């Protein structure tokens, strides 16, 4: 049976995909991205921790890990779900911007959360106390050291467009209307380059769409899983 590999993003954990894990008709494996210092290493570990055919479901940085899994072991990937992600290599000036956040996280993780999280969200959700508390708690659990290690992995990330055209498995891309960090255009570029991809756009959500709009994101993924793998879990 196919296993869903649920992959969180930067300074995140299994909470990102909790609603999907509870609803999914297939067994799932919660990925831990806290231990490796490269996207390739994260992908390699997840492939080693699992068996058989996989659908890798990644949010943000986790989407990059999912694509890398398909690059490393195409025979094992039955499908990919890529939410709020991107494909570009490191950009000019990115290292300095990231370093400022690394320094802030080491100085005060709460101040880091206050600086980093609001720009990631749909502006209408910044005042949502329950959502913000859940996100801040997740950042605290990750901590400054994990954040720094994961930033190092992101700064060394590959140009995924170099291998996206060779990913033969079906891909569901999930973009959010208010995501300024990973805009819809990036997802359209991935969809155009991949042999078999479709795009779902979530309204009233930013970069943390799986937590901002969990019902809508879960519904999009469940519908895609049913269309692509319905016979397997009927």
Q: Each predicted region: which residue ranges?
A:
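Conserved HGGG/HGGXW glycine-rich cap/lid loop of the alpha/beta-hydrolase fold
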Residues: 1-45
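Catalytic histidine neighborhood in serine/cysteine hydrolases
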Residues: 191-207
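Short beta-strand/loop motif that positions the catalytic acidic residue
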Residues: 167, 173-175, 179
């Amino acid at each position: 049976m196919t296993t869903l590999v649920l992959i969180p993003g930067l300074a995140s954990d299994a909470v990102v995909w909790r609603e999907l894990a509870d609803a999914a008709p297939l067994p799932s494996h919660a990925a831990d991205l806290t231990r490796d210092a490269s996207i390739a290493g994260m992908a390699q570990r997840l492939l080693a921790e699992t068996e058989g055919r996989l659908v890798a479901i990644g949010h943000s940085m986790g989407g990059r890990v999912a694509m890398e899994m398909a690059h490393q072991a195409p025979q094992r990937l039955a499908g990919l779900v890529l939410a709020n992600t991107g494909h570009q290599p490191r950009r000019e000036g990115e290292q300095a911007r990231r370093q400022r956040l690394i320094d802030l996280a080491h100085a005060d993780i709460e101040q880091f959360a206050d600086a980093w999280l609001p720009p990631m969200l749909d502006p209408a959700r910044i005042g949502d106390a329950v959502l913000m508390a859940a996100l801040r708690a997740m950042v605290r659990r990750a901590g400054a050291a994990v954040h720094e290690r994961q930033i190092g992995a992101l700064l060394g990330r590959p140009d995924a467009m170099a291998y996206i055209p060779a990913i033969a498995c079906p891909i569901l891309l999930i973009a959010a209307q208010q995501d300024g960090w990973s805009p819809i255009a990036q997802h359209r570029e991935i969809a155009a380059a991949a042999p078999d991809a479709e795009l779902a756009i979530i309204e009233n959500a930013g970069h943390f769409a799986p937590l901002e709009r969990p019902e809508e994101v879960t519904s999009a993924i469940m519908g895609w899983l049913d269309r692509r793998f319905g016979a397997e879990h009927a």
